């Protein structure tokens, strides 16, 4: 598979290979895989070990979130949450079957939510920055952070600059080895053009109105999908301001977060299962 070819190239080029891009994942993931090549492991096992480790981090983080804010039976609810996350079919297939790394960035997003509601915004945005350094999909959480800023005034707009700063910091080993600084930006810019299909096996808005396998619709709706998503998210911001929605409530925050992520998946182009 493509993961095996990435492994072979990274192992062959050693640490100096960080100066060149391998695959289409961001630099921090390439650094982790380089470190794994130093161990006597089969490539596929190594990828899956990394992902499975973060499955446990994700389960623990989610359990911590529930334990921190549950009003009763906290221990039981935390244990049930931990079990539900770790034994979820989505989590199991994603990591141990497909060797994907989604549990990495989602773990840090959960930790960010936990620390945000513990009134530790710097730590929260550091975790968001780490998540963003691993996966572009972290941007799905950004709108709800803007809502939180507007609603509560408990964070500063300056906190948002922590996100790109952490991305740069985590990519520094590759920059030191000679990687062009602009690569930090172009990696994600190129990802937005990956697939060139309006939707990829994702039952979203575009699956209802066009043939997802026809590349014509990708070019027809790509820019429209961005404007539509921004418009829908903007309407929600207006509602939050007009209705004076209090996002200090964790329950309200989580519901708004779920709606925000769902909106991005439903209306952005090239979403896949």
Please place each PLM-identified region on the residue numbering.
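Transmembrane and membrane-interface helices of multi-pass
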Residues: 66-70, 78-91
